[in-house]
């Protein structure tokens, strides 16, 4: 009887061990499934985070490019503004200088029409001459310069040809007579010199 009891107990113990092992295997299987689910979710989350990181990096790159472009645009605007201010400063007198040119022309005509040697007009001539020199000196301080090309080669950028005449005294395309002087303001042409050009 004790053998049978021992066998029954052994069978019972074996069954209990098997059920415990099966339970553990089931638990391990569910733990593995749970771990696999967690791993899959973690991988999915990592992919989402990597995608979000790439989008954020793309946004950062785009914003960095926008900042660089904006800084370059600001520099360009600053440079253009400085150039515009410099031009405005240099050429603010242009309209005023244009109004003064007829006064200078009239003084030169007065000098040309007055006899410097005649006793009656000598004092007037000297007075107009001094006034003209003083006036020219004053306007030169502000960048106004006379263009008097007598005897120079004709330059269409600075001179306006009134006509051409044959001449043995001057080479071809040489200014042989200045009808009206030209003027520049800070090296920019204000009025071309009216000239007669030699044909040669």
UniProtKB/Swiss-Prot annotation:
One of its GO terms (biological process) is protein folding. Keywords: Chaperone, Cytoplasm, Stress response. The keyword NADP does not apply. Transmembrane segments: none annotated. HAMAP family: GrpE. Participates actively in the response to hyperosmotic and heat shock by preventing the aggregation of stress-denatured proteins, in association with DnaK and GrpE. It is the nucleotide exchange factor for DnaK and may function as a thermosensor. Unfolded proteins bind initially to DnaJ; upon interaction with the DnaJ-bound protein, DnaK hydrolyzes its bound ATP, resulting in the formation of a stable complex. GrpE releases ADP from DnaK; ATP binding to DnaK triggers the release of the substrate protein, thus completing the reaction cycle. GO terms for cellular component: cytosol. It is found in: Cytoplasm. This is Protein GrpE. It comes from Shewanella piezotolerans (strain WP3 / JCM 13877). GO terms for molecular function: adenyl-nucleotide exchange factor activity; protein homodimerization activity; protein-folding chaperone binding; unfolded protein binding. Homodimer. Belongs to the GrpE family. Disulfide bonds: none annotated. Gene3D superfamilies: 3.90.20.20, Head domain of nucleotide exchange factor GrpE (2.30.22.10).
């Amino acid at each position: 009887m004790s053998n049978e009891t021992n066998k029954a107990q052994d069978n019972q113990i074996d069954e209990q061990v098997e059920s415990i092992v099966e339970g553990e295997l089931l638990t391990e299987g569910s733990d593995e499934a749970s771990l696999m689910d967690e791993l899959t979710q973690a991988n999915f989350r990592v992919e989402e985070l990597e995608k979000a990181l790439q989008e954020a990096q793309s946004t950062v790159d785009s914003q960095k490019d926008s900042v660089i472009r904006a800084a370059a645009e600001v520099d360009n605007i600053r440079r253009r503004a400085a150039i515009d201010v410099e031009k405005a400063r240099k050429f603010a007198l242009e309209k005023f200088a244009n109004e003064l040119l007829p006064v200078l022309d009239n003084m030169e005509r007065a000098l040309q029409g007055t006899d410097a040697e005649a006793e009656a007009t000598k004092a007037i001539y000297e007075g107009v001459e001094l006034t003209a020199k003083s006036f020219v000196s004053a306007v030169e301080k502000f960048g106004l310069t006379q263009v008097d090309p007598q005897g120079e080669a004709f330059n269409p950028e600075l001179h306006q040809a009134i006509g051409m005449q044959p001449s043995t005294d001057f080479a071809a395309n040489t200014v042989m007579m200045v009808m009206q002087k030209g003027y520049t303001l800070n090296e920019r042409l204000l009025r071309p010199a009216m000239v007669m050009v030699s044909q040669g």
